[in-house]
C-alpha cells in the first residue's frame, strides 16, 4: 500500500497534499476552517445537484418548483434546507478563515492570500445568484437592486445592466442565466481551491507563533486528519441543528411570497452574509461612490500585505494591534446589524461612522500600531 501511495502518479499527489504533508506541530483549531470550507463546498455541490434535478429556471414555475421540492420530493425539504443553511455555514467558516488569516499574518503569503480573495469574490457571486433562484419577493428585488448598481459605471453602465438582464428588467432571461452560472460556479470554485492549495503547499502553513516551523514538522495524517474529522463532526452537528430546528432563522420571510414586480417590499436586503458590504454601500450617498466602497471593502484585504509594518508576523504578542483587530471585528458586527435596518435615523449615521471606522482601522490604525509596537519592543 505504501508503495502505491508514494509511487502512483495520481495517488502520490493526494499523498503529498493530505497524508505525508509536513505540517507545523502547533497549529490550533483556527486552522480547521480550511478543511471545513472544503466540506461545505462538497455539501453544497451535492445538495445543489439534487435540487437542480427538480428545479425549473422559468419565472412562471421557479417558485412552484421549489414548493414542489419541499412538499413532494422524498426528503426534498431536507435537501433544500441543507443547501440554504449550508451557504450560511459556508460564510461563517469563510469569515472565520479570513479573520484567522488577518490575526496571524497569513496575508504575508501573497499568492495564497490573493487567491483567497478571488475565491471570496467567487463565493459571494455564487451565493447572490443562488439567492435569486427561488424567485420570491426578496429574490426578485434583491436581483433588481444589486444588478442595477452596475448602471453607476460611466458610459457603459446602462447597456451593461440590460445585457446582464437580457432585457429591460429582471425577467425570465435573467433567471435562466443566473441558474446556469450558479450551477457552473461551484466547479470553477473547486478549481480555484486547488490553485489556493497549490500556492499554500509552496510555502507551507503559517502557525500561531508566526515563526518558521521547518525544524518541527509532523505528518498531516493521522494528527490533523483526526483533528479535521472532529471539526467536520461539529460543523455537521451545528448544520443539522440549524436545518432541523431553525431552518428559516437566517432566511427572509418575504421570500415565501412569489416575486411581484408591481409590489416592492418595505425593506430590500440581501442574505445576512452580505449585510456588512450592503451597509457600506448604503452609507455613501453617491451611487458610483457606494459601488466603489462595496468593492473596496473586500479588495482592501489585498492591501494588508503592503500595510504590514510590524517586525512580528501575527498579533499573538502585539496588544495594541490586537485591540485594533477586535474593534474591527466589533465594527463588522455593527455593519452587519445596520445592513438589516431601514434607511432612517439613527441607523444612517451609525452606518456612516462604522464604514469610516472599517477602512480607517485597516488602512491607517493597524499599520501605525505596528510601528508603535516596533518602537516599544525596540525592534528597529
Swiss-Prot record:
Topology with respect to the bilayer: Multi-pass membrane protein
UniProt-annotated binding residues for heme b b566: 97, 196
Residues that bind heme b b562: 83, 182
Molecular function in Gene Ontology: metal ion binding; ubiquinol-cytochrome-c reductase activity
GO cellular component, one term: mitochondrial inner membrane
Binding site for a ubiquinone: 201
Location within or outside the cell: Mitochondrion inner membrane
Alphabetized InterPro entries for the sequence: Cyt_b/b6_C, Cyt_b/b6_C_sf, Cyt_b/b6_N, Cytb/b6-like_sf, Cytochrome_b, Cytochrome_b_C_euk/bac, Cytochrome_b_N_euk/bac, Di-haem_cyt_TM
Gene Ontology BP annotations: mitochondrial electron transport, ubiquinol to cytochrome c
Cofactor(s), by name: heme b
Transmembrane segments: 33-53, 77-98, 113-133, 178-198, 226-246, 288-308, 320-340, 347-367
Any Pfam family matching the protein: Cytochrome_B
Main subcellular location of this protein, as a coarse class: mitochondrion
Residue ranges of coiled coil: none
Keyword line: Electron transport, Heme, Iron, Membrane, Metal-binding, Mitochondrion, Mitochondrion inner membrane, Respiratory chain, Transmembrane, Transmembrane helix, Transport, Ubiquinone
Record Gene3D superfamilies: Cytochrome Bc1 Complex, Chain C (1.20.810.10)
Further comment: Heme 1 (or BL or b562) is low-potential and absorbs at about 562 nm, and heme 2 (or BH or b566) is high-potential and absorbs at about 566 nm.
Family that this chain belongs to: Belongs to the cytochrome b family.
Subunit structure: The cytochrome bc1 complex contains 11 subunits: 3 respiratory subunits (MT-CYB, CYC1 and UQCRFS1), 2 core proteins (UQCRC1 and UQCRC2) and 6 low-molecular weight proteins (UQCRH/QCR6, UQCRB/QCR7, UQCRQ/QCR8, UQCR10/QCR9, UQCR11/QCR10 and a cleavage product of UQCRFS1). This cytochrome bc1 complex then forms a dimer.
Reported function: Component of the ubiquinol-cytochrome c reductase complex (complex III or cytochrome b-c1 complex) that is part of the mitochondrial respiratory chain. The b-c1 complex mediates electron transfer from ubiquinol to cytochrome c. Contributes to the generation of a proton gradient across the mitochondrial membrane that is then used for ATP synthesis.
Name of the protein in question: Cytochrome b
Record organism: Dicrostonyx torquatus
Gene, per the UniProt record: MT-CYB
Amino acid at each position: 500500500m505504501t508503495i502505491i501511495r508514494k509511487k502512483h502518479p495520481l495517488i502520490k499527489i493526494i499523498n503529498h497534499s493530505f497524508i505525508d504533508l509536513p505540517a507545523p506541530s502547533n497549529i490550533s483549531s483556527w486552522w480547521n476552517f480550511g478543511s471545513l470550507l472544503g466540506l461545505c463546498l462538497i455539501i453544497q455541490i451535492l445538495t445543489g445537484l439534487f435540487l437542480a434535478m427538480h428545479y425549473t429556471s422559468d419565472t412562471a414555475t421557479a417558485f412552484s418548483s421549489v414548493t414542489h421540492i419541499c412538499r413532494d420530493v422524498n426528503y426534498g425539504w431536507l435537501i433544500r434546507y441543507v443547501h440554504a443553511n449550508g451557504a450560511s455555514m459556508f460564510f461563517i467558516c469563510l469569515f472565520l478563515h479570513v479573520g484567522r488569516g488577518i490575526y496571524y499574518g497569513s496575508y504575508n503569503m501573497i499568492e495564497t492570500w490573493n487567491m483567497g480573495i478571488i475565491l471570496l469574490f467567487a463565493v459571494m457571486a455564487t451565493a447572490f445568484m443562488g439567492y435569486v433562484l427561488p424567485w420570491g419577493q426578496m429574490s426578485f428585488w434583491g436581483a433588481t437592486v444589486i444588478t442595477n448598481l452596475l448602471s453607476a459605471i460611466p458610459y457603459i453602465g446602462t447597456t451593461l445592466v440590460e445585457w446582464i438582464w437580457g432585457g429591460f428588467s429582471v425577467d425570465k432571461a435573467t433567471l435562466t442565466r443566473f441558474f446556469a452560472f450558479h450551477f457552473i460556479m461551484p466547479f470553477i470554485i473547486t478549481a480555484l481551491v486547488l490553485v489556493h492549495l497549490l500556492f499554500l503547499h509552496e510555502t507551507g502553513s503559517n502557525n500561531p507563533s508566526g515563526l518558521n516551523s521547518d525544524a518541527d514538522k509532523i505528518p498531516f495524517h493521522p494528527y490533523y486528519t483526526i483533528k479535521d474529522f472532529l471539526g467536520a463532526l461539529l460543523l455537521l452537528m451545528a448544520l443539522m441543528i440549524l436545518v432541523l430546528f431553525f431552518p428559516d432563522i437566517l432566511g427572509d420571510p418575504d421570500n415565501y411570497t412569489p416575486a411581484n414586480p408591481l409590489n416592492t417590499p418595505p425593506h430590500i436586503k440581501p442574505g445576512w452574509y452580505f449585510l456588512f458590504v450592503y451597509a457600506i454601500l448604503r452609507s455613501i450617498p453617491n451611487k458610483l461612490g457606494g459601488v466603489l466602497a462595496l468593492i473596496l471593502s473586500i479588495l482592501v484585504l489585498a492591501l494588508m500585505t503592503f500595510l504590514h509594518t510590524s517586525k512580528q508576523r501575527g498579533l499573538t504578542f502585539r496588544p495594541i494591534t490586537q485591540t485594533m483587530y477586535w474593534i474591527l471585528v466589533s465594527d463588522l458586527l455593527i455593519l452587519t446589524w445596520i445592513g438589516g435596518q431601514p434607511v432612517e435615523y439613527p441607523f444612517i449615521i451609525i452606518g456612516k461612522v462604522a464604514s469610516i471606522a472599517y477602512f480607517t482601522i485597516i488602512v491607517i490604525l493597524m499599520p501605525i500600531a505596528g510601528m508603535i509596537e516596533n518602537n516599544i519592543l525596540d525592534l528597529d
